[in-house]
Amino acid sequence: MKKSLIAVALLATIGSTNAATIYDKDGTTLDIFGNIEVGYRNANAAKYDKVSSYNSSDSTIMNTAKIGISGRSQINENLYAIGMAQWDVASGDSFDDLKARHQFIGIDAQNYGTLLFGRGDNAFYTVAGVSDIFHDLDFEVSDYYLTGDQNPGLIMYTLSSLGWDLRASFGSAKSNINNTPLNYKYQFAFSGSTRLKSDITISYALAYYKFSYEGDVRDQVAYFAKKMQNMYHLNDNDILAFANANRPEHKIDKGIAISYGTYGDGLYAALNFVSTRYEHYSHHLYSYEAVIDYAFENGLGLTAGYGCKRFHHTNILGDLNLGVRYGVNANFNLFAEAQIDVNSNPEIYYSHEEITDRALAENKILCGAEFLF
């Protein structure tokens, strides 16, 4: 489970429940926080892990950790400087396996909003994130996770007022987006959400990505060529020339979400729908995610959900997720999750390499324990 850039900003603003304050003087505080996780994963779940590189066909026991630091300093009565950084640490033998998650500094102007600069999720996460509640085996069928997830060079402004939460973000140039050959010149996103008196939240978001093609573009063209070949029924001799002449210059995500309750406090349910349009694609991509969770007062939590991604009237991905967790105390949790393939046809859209590397259309199982600090 991830946290949005704004949600993580709250760690710097008000502190985390498990964070340890290491400095508190003259209106400035500094906290450290994180977790250590050890668990069993079958081979497909191990390949799915984004922190560790795992290519074996065997199940394994894996360990990872997250470490973060956050700070807050009062400038005047209504203005605060905030900062935060968080990293994933895989089970390697050195810090070469360190991966940045969120890194930002910013200004919290209270009633006038929060302005952040750094690395994180763009404003579209307001919609995509309502179903991001599983411990590790998230759906990620939404195409948002290809281009908008945890990007550097991001500027985000958030204003919460009169029952509305408004967010706008702009991202500067980025190469090799999320381990793909794709580059974008810039991106921007906007979202708005409101919580009704019935404890229902409704959200809408839009994101635009301008792709960049500079220097040697063969890998980028090949990435789209493999997808366009199935769309336009092209033979191997024509596909590269076709893809180069019709390479997408932009991508647009539009999404809407509705949720009930607050995750971790009794009943929580959410549904989102995302439409994605690549220039020169024959059809839109559509994704749907629905989740339900119940957190009991004794620390037990049960989660279930279904996610699917469709292209040209066909499910290219379909996953049923089940999860259980138990909080032994505020710092120690046990968890287990399963992701079951439901009539996926990834070969219609994805390349063989993507299907293998991401273990698409494969059943995944994991269980483990984590210690929070």
What residue ranges belong to the model's regions?
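Gram-negative bacterial Sec-dependent N-terminal signal peptides
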Residues: 1-20
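Residue-level signature of outer-membrane beta-barrel architecture
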Residues: 71-73, 107-109, 159-161, 192-196, ...
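Outer-membrane beta-barrel "beta-signal"
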Residues: 326-328, 359-373
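Transmembrane beta-strands of outer-membrane beta-barrel pores
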Residues: 38-44, 87-91, 119-123, 161-163, ...
